[in-house]
């Protein structure tokens, strides 16, 4: 015979514990919220029915004695709704239909975590690492395509080719080729950058390549000559434009101006007084009214 006892739990919920009549303390099954129902509701199982109060056992048959009611009947948990006891449905994980919203929320949370991780991976590294990576990419990109046929083999040189340098190449002092002359130098005498074309010629718009000190000074002389030639061209252009402007645009004079001759001084005058005509100097307009007094 199966008996159902209602016990008050320690938590906020009261659950029904089911015990077998033959062994009331050893055959304890997992409590299920599907068996919670109102005191006046009738519960049915897979083989029989239980009517009246929960403690009534008058209609039980020998076929279902010692067996547990079925937990898959959907009518057993229809008395309690989600609005009345939401905590029951929140804590219940056996029914996939009830736990679907919470599973989707967990899935959304996991997707957000994955997106945050992807964002953290996509963030650029520190300034030092980024500068190193940029310099390496720039070095590799600018080294592609330049001619290396004129480079001297490493086995031919064991000392720096700079005249006053005696550094011997080894484990700590490495060989460095000048991209223009192709000779081998130490790191100190091959640390300059000059713009070159693909056929290792000077070009102001070319890419920067490693060069030795001698080639760097040759580049400075070449650039100085280019600047001097450009400045001379500008001077020649200005000198040719100025006379053309002078001939095409002579100095302007007043429209209504009349030139009046200035009489010369008479050498016979002892006192050096000027004649009366000399009082009129410069130019006089046409509409000038002369006084008759």
Curated annotation (Swiss-Prot):
Activity control, per UniProt: Activated by glutamine.
Cell compartments where the protein resides: Vacuole membrane
Keywords: Membrane, Metal-binding, Phosphoprotein, Transducer, Vacuole, Zinc, Zinc-finger
Domain of life: Eukaryota
Membrane disposition: Peripheral membrane protein
Entry domain remark: The FYVE-type zinc finger domain contributes to vacuolar localization.
PANTHER family in UniProt: ZINC FINGER FYVE DOMAIN-CONTAINING PROTEIN (PTHR46319:SF3)
Full protein name: Glutamine sensor pib2
Gene it is expressed from: pib2
């Amino acid at each position: 015979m199966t008996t159902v006892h209602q016990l008050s739990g320690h938590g906020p919920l009261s659950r029904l514990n089911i015990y077998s009549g033959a062994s009331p303390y050893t055959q304890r099954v997992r409590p299920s919220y599907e068996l919670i129902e109102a005191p006046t509701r009738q519960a049915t199982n897979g083989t029989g029915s239980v009517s009246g109060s929960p403690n009534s056992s008058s209609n039980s048959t020998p076929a279902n004695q010692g067996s547990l009611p079925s937990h898959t009947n959907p009518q057993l948990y229809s008395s309690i709704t989600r609005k009345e006891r939401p905590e029951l449905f929140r804590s219940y994980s056996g029914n996939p239909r009830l736990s679907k919203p919470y599973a989707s929320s967990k899935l959304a949370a996991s997707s957000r975590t994955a997106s945050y991780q992807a964002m953290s991976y996509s963030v650029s590294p520190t300034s030092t690492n980024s500068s190193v990576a940029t310099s390496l990419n720039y070095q590799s990109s600018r080294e592609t395509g330049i001619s290396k046929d004129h480079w001297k083999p490493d086995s031919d040189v064991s000392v720096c080719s700079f005249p006053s340098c005696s550094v011997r190449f080894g484990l700590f002092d490495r060989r460095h080729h000048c991209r223009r002359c192709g000779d081998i130098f130490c790191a100190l005498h091959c640390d300059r950058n000059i713009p070159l074309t693909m056929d290792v010629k000077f070009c102001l718009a070319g890419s920067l390549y490693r060069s030795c000190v001698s080639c760097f000074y040759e580049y400075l002389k070449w650039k100085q000559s280019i600047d001097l030639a450009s400045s001379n061209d500008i001077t020649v252009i200005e000198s040719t434009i100025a006379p053309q402007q002078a001939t095409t645009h002579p100095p302007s004079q007043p429209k209504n101006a009349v030139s009046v001759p200035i009489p010369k001084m008479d050498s016979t005058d002892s006192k050096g007084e000027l004649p009366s005509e000399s009082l009129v100097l410069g130019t006089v307009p046409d509409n000038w009214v002369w006084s008759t007094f």
